[in-house]
Regions:
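FNR/FR-type flavoprotein reductase catalytic core
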Residues: 1-89
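Local cysteine-cluster metal-coordination motifs and their immediate loop/turn environment
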Residues: 61, 85-110
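Generic secondary-structure boundary signal with a strong preference for alpha-helix termini
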Residues: 70, 103-105, 121
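Ferredoxin-type iron-sulfur electron-transfer modules in oxidoreductases and energy-metabolism complexes
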Residues: 70-72, 114, 123
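Short Fe-S-cluster ligation motifs
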Residues: 96, 116-124
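Charge-dense, low-complexity polyampholytic segments
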Residues: 110-116
Length: 124
């Protein structure tokens, strides 16, 4: 299931936005977008970092392997944006499961830049 289908289609029509929709494996024979791992697709498409932001949303392992590629492509840490909601459990800062150093993903995020993440303890 693809969420925000209309919004993604509208972005894809713009000249100033490049959208790469990707799944690991396509179960639908009519799937017309990228198939493969996001780090691989990122290397293959080699998006320009000039005046651009990279927005990364997915499982932690995908984020982990995509961030270094974006850095190699020249994206500065303040323009790499990621969603870390998979770390949340209670959603109100009580359980402590989502804390990264002094930050709580549920209260201070879940969207962070790589610049912000680089200031947290390395255990994440």
């Amino acid at each position: 299931m693809l969420l925000y289908r209309d919004e993604l289609a509208a972005w894809n029509e713009r000249d100033d936005i490049r959208v790469h929709i990707t799944v690991d494996a396509a179960d639908d024979p009519e799937w017309r977008y990228n198939v493969g791992f996001v780090p691989t697709i990122t290397q293959e498409t080699a998006p320009s970092a000039k005046e651009a932001y990279a927005i990364v949303c997915g499982p932690p392992i995908m984020i982990k392997f995509t961030l270094p590629i974006l850095s190699e492509l020249g994206f500065p840490p303040e323009r790499i944006i990621m969603s870390l909601e998979m770390r949340m459990k209670c959603g109100i800062g009580m359980c402590g499961r989502c804390n990264i150093g002094q930050e709580f993903v549920c209260k201070d995020g879940p969207v962070f830049t790589l610049e912000q993440l680089n200031k947290t303890p390395r255990e994440y």
